[in-house]
């Protein structure tokens, strides 16, 4: 990433994201450069609840959850720059996914590295280039579009 490296542990992540078990999919932020990009980590454990059914004899992390992990990293990048005015009632939503490609399976024991680069912000929509890697090889990639919405009911 580059010059200013910001590292966020799980405690800080929990203050920035509303997600909790079993859908919190970022364990640590390794690097964060405001207005540029983020490099985060998801340790993929056999204890993940989705492995019971996807697939019992050859567990593979569902592709949609890899995309969700990338979106959570994008949310951390966004919220690290711009703290929500009302965090209890603020949610981060997907509004689009373009060019999603899955290149290799993600299996128990893998460390999924989530690389998200800011591309642009127009009319309330953030656009990111997102790449998930395992052992330096691309597992999935996509362009993500996300927005922040305030709800009227606390989670």
UniProtKB/Swiss-Prot annotation:
Domain of life of the organism encoding this protein: Bacteria
GO biological process assignments: fatty acid biosynthetic process; lipid A biosynthetic process
Lineage: Bacteria, Pseudomonadati, Pseudomonadota, Betaproteobacteria, Burkholderiales
Protein's UniProt keywords contain Iron-sulfur: no
One cellular component term from this protein's GO annotations in UniProt: membrane
Name by which UniProt lists this protein: 3-hydroxyacyl-[acyl-carrier-protein] dehydratase FabZ
Swiss-Prot/TrEMBL keywords: Cytoplasm, Lipid A biosynthesis, Lipid biosynthesis, Lipid metabolism, Lyase
Residues annotated as catalytic: 54
